[in-house]
Amino acid sequence: MLVTAGAVGIPGVLIGPLESEFGWSNAEISAAFAVRLLLFGMMGPFAAAFMNRFGLRPVILLSQTLIGAGIFGALWMTELWQLTLLMGVVVGLGTGLTAMVLGATVATRWFVNRRGLVIGLLTASTATGQLVFLPVMAALTEAVGWRAALSVSLVALFVAAIAALMLMRNRPSDLGLAPYGEMAVVPAPPQQSLLAMLASPIVTLRDAAGTRMFWLLFGTFFICGMSTNGLIQTHFIPLCGDFGLAAVTAAGVLAVIGLFDFAGTVGSGWLSDRFDNRWLLFWYYGLRGLSLIWLPFSDFSLY
């Protein structure tokens, strides 16, 4: 999850160099990366079904392979459609296979007690990936070019894939263990047929779409994703460049955001075990909205 989060944060570092080298506009590059975000979200329900049908390890390995293939191909791209295909479609499919649902799936299968805290810790890996990778990627891009920076991310993906192959297990019952908080080993549920597996996300979405709560959550998470992935992660570094801040400095600011994101995500997991989640979301979205309203009126200085 940490390495996948690093791959998700790459576009913010690449927009400036791609504009300079190929002459593509910010809007054209952003449209290609928007395809990645669209697939990142749409793959979530199907990723959960794939994990239930094939297991965690095969899905993780497929995810890392797709991300690696997209980044590797991008090293030789020369046309805008290649950026859309490789960094949009291929990387979007790869990141979508794990980033949205892997943490929740692992927490649900392995933990009964402290499940909210565990989900918070695993979700915080997104912030950690941002904290670790963005400053490194920005520094490498400035020093030796964006292709060398992408090559480093390929090495990280390879290491993560090897770790998943060696260490990842599907369920506690694979090791004869009970989930944390349970006394008895919980057997794996019977497998669905391939057709039922592919249909289950669509059926679930159809049923959920008839409820008011689904659309309320859909709307809030849509705005959340638009302001986080769409606005901050993708456009914050180029925006800071327009105001005279270097890319490495802007990536450092994002790393600070990632640091507080980590603390907030872990704390949110702890709070969700104790308080009404509706009130938690009220404060989270309210504070985020106030910060975004204030941002255009700041002087964009480092401090």
Task: List PLM regions with ranges.
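Extracytoplasmic
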Residues: 1-26, 43-47, 134, 229-237
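Hydrophobic core of transmembrane alpha-helices in multi-pass small-molecule transporters
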Residues: 2, 67-70, 82-98, 222-223, ...
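Extracytoplasmic gate region of multi-pass secondary transporters
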Residues: 11-16, 206-270
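Cytoplasmic membrane-interface "Motif A"-like loop-to-helix N-cap segments
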Residues: 52-64, 274-285
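C-terminal ends and interior cores of transmembrane alpha-helices
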Residues: 65-78, 287-299
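Helix-loop-helix hairpin linking two adjacent transmembrane segments in secondary transporters
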Residues: 122-175
